[in-house]
């Protein structure tokens, strides 16, 4: 059955009149990116005056918060102090790199908490604040748990991961990401780019028989990518059909000259075979997508609240919880590298692929999350 309407911007068939959701998101993003300085100040002022509406996920405050943070890096200490005074502890990103007085207020609230739900929110906030005293507090709570710890699934070191860092048993800080972020933007398939999403391969998946794909090919020698510390090519290879059905992430090792060795994998249900749901048309769309690396860096949270943005570095838009893979070779946590939103590269796909890597062992992990 053919649909009655098409998106006036991109031509996607629709069952309603108007923009498709991706073009609508892009329109809203471009409008927010075009805010003048006085508009940003007005948005900040309104957020301060109505901070409780942020915790209640009410618009325009909720949308304004994410646009201020993600597109303008414009969450000020004043906003953070007002949020603390109002006991607004969600979204935790509001406290990213908050000043020392706000950090001390968060620590006081955490150490005074009686219930696991409050402690969970406050540890997330402290993870986003992220300085040495914040780490000392979470480390102390890991070594000497409070009664509310029994009501939580994970330790404080796992909460620290929300802020892009964690610590080991000796109390040494471990960084889990990068303080630089670049977007993937639409170019052309023939346009030269140091990052490519979804390069076709000839080999097939042992589980479903579908084509394997180099989901991310990244040349760290490009000046924009020097922050990654990769003096060569990283390739992340998996089966786009099966990566969401595996028992754990998909892994491969890479060599800086572009070589790849895919690790054996196991389906979540223990079966040897499964069906391939990715059609030839989907493979074509996937491997001929137009995305190229953007020319300029963007704020770290640029892609952290969007379902239509692919990014390298910065913070991910975790569909579920932040999840950092343990390197199968050295046992250390891997570093978050990139996110690929499936629906940006072929229609009607769900969820997000998160790419992480171990810079010491040259091993990549790819994991899928969806609602």
What are these regions (language model features)?
Residues 1-2, 338:
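Extreme N-terminus of proteins, especially the signal/transit-peptide cleavage junction
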Residues 17-18, 26-371:
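Long compositionally biased, domain-poor regions of proteins
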């Amino acid at each position: 059955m053919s649909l009655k309407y098409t998106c006036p911007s991109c031509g996607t068939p629709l069952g309603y009149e108007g923009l498709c959701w991706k073009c609508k998101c892009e329109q809203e993003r471009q409008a927010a990116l075009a805010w003048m300085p006085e508009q940003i100040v007005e948005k900040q002022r309104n957020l301060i005056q109505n901070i409780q509406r942020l915790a209640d996920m009410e618009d325009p405050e909720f949308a304004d918060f994410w646009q201020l943070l993600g597109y303008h890096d414009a969450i000020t200490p004043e906003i953070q102090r007002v949020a603390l005074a109002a006991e607004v502890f969600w979204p935790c990103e509001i406290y990213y790199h908050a000043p020392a007085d706000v950090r001390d207020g968060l620590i006081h609230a955490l150490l005074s908490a009686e219930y696991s739900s409050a402690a969970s929110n406050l540890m997330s906030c402290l993870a986003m604040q992220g300085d040495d005293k914040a780490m000392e507090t979470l480390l102390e709570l890991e070594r000497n748990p409070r009664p509310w710890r029994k009501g939580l699934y994970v330790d404080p070191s796992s909460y620290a991961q929300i802020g892009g860092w964690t610590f080991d048993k000796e109390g040494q800080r471990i960084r889990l990401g990068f303080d630089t972020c670049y977007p993937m933007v639409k170019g052309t398939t023939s346009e030269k780019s140091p990052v490519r999403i979804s390069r076709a391969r000839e080999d097939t998946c042992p589980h479903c028989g579908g084509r394997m794909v180099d989901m991310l090919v990244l040349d760290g020698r490009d000046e924009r990518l020097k922050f990654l510390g990769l003096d060569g090519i990283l390739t992340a290879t998996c089966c786009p059909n099966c990566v969401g059905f595996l028992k754990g992430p998909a892994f491969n090792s890479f060599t800086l000259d572009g070589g790849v060795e895919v690790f054996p994998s196991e389906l979540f249900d223990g079966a040897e075979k499964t069906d391939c749901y990715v059609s030839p048309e989907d493979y074509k769309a996937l491997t001929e997508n137009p995305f190229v690396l953007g020319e300029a860096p963007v704020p770290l949270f640029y892609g952290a609240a969007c379902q239509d943005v692919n990014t390298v570095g910065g913070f991910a838009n975790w569909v579920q919880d932040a999840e950092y893979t343990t390197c199968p070779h050295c046992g250390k946590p891997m570093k978050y590298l990139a996110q690929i939103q499936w629906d940006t590269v072929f229609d009607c796909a769900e969820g997000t692929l998160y790419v992480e890597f171990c810079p010491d062992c040259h091993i990549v992990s790819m994991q899928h999350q969806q609602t």
